[in-house]
Curated annotation (Swiss-Prot):
InterPro entries hit by this protein: TrbC/VirB2
GO cellular component terms, semicolon-separated: cell outer membrane
Listed name of the protein: Protein virB2
Signal peptide region: 1-19
Regions that span the bilayer: 65-85, 94-114
Record has Membrane as a keyword: yes
Originating organism: Rhizobium radiobacter
Keywords for this protein: Cell outer membrane, Crown gall tumor, Membrane, Plasmid, Signal, Transmembrane, Transmembrane helix
Coiled-coil ranges from the UniProt annotation: none
Described purpose of this protein according to its UniProt entry: VirB proteins are suggested to act at the bacterial surface and there play an important role in directing T-DNA transfer to plant cells.
Subunit (UniProt): Interacts with host plant RTNLB1 protein.
Length: 121
């Protein structure tokens, strides 16, 4: 119990502002370097304008093409491989199989279902 009282007295001697100054002084060199680097290496932003250039439908089509293309097929293959490895090591679970198969069905079936419901080509 005496040990706790000694630490409590030690903590009472440090005020909050004193503790903050210790933290700030220990971090000052790295903060100063980071600020100097960000000021010296700043330049104009290379962003597109928000008002024009790309139609939202085009952006959605680009995302669908990306997901349904080779990237999505690779994800589907990796999911099936994960199911096979889990079955090989005896960690099979119906939840894992249902989640992966359901995700594949949703990923590849959503485009077809959307086109069917909207009458798109």
């Amino acid at each position: 119990m005496r040990c706790f009282e000694r630490y409590r007295l030690h903590l009472n001697r440090l005020s909050l502002s004193n503790a903050m100054m210790r933290v700030i002084s220990s971090c000052a060199p790295s903060l100063g370097g980071a600020m100097a680097w960000s000021i010296s290496s700043c330049g104009p932003a290379a962003a597109q304008s928000a008002g024009g250039g790309t139609d939202p439908a085009t952006m959605v089509n680009n995302i669908c093409t990306f997901i349904l293309g080779p990237f999505g097929q690779s994800l589907a293959v990796l999911g099936i491989v994960a199911i096979g490895i889990s079955w090989m090591f005896g960690r099979r679970s119906l939840g894992l199989v249902a989640g992966v198969v359901g995700g594949i069905v949703i990923m590849f079936g959503a485009s077809f279902l959307g086109q069917t419901l909207t009458g798109g080509s």
